Amino acid sequence: NSVIAGRFMPEFLEHRATRILRSRFNITATKVVKNRWLSADDIDLLIKVTILMSAMGANKTGSVIKYIARIPHESRGRVLWLTPTITLSANTIQRLRDAGIDVTGYKELTACEKRAGLLEIGDFVVFSIQSLHYTQKDYGIVVIDEVEALFFTFGKDAATHQDEETKEDRLVHNFARFKEILFKCKKLLLMDVFITQTTIDFVNNLAM
């Protein structure tokens, strides 16, 4: 795994601090980015899991969008962009479309259409984690924005994983599907302003 550390703490950019971070969180490789903003060039093409950790406004989302846009359509496979909230999904969809990327947004479909498989009719989909039970296909690239908040949805507030119409609990199904998708994908990009040991352990335990 690799961590791209941004300028969210000046002292973090010191060599010693980076070394401490790596040892504390069992990270095999780190890359400190001293520029103010991240870019697509900062994302390692050869490593399956990349964690982009930086302050808000450091261009995490923008760098990932450009990274994906550079990959030839026929070789990148299907792309899944997961978020913890509807609002963040809507914002991301607009940014992707502004970048010229054709994307399917789950709020643009009815529950009936999603159950019929229309959510995955395109090869680039964006939705919040609670709708994961509608998916069946594998994905070459998976992006998780605000990964810590996304993991939190699997905690005590399981009500967030209820079916929007039937109110059926989808928590177990969503989590099982979540692990399956991450295990099978070729590239996993995680983004947040901070990363906990729980997230690092989860990624390592996927036996990638």
Report the location of each language-model feature.
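SF2 helicase catalytic motif II
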Residues: 136-190
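Inter-Walker segment of RecA-like/P-loop motor cores
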Residues: 96-136
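Structural recognition of the conserved hydrophobic beta-strand(s) that form the central parallel beta-sheet
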Residues: 81, 125-128, 143, 186-193
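Pre-Walker A adenine-sensing motif
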Residues: 17-46
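Walker A/P-loop
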Residues: 46-66
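Modules that initiate DNA replication and primer synthesis
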Residues: 1-12
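Interdomain hinge/linker at the junction between the two RecA-like core domains of SF2 helicases
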Residues: 197-208
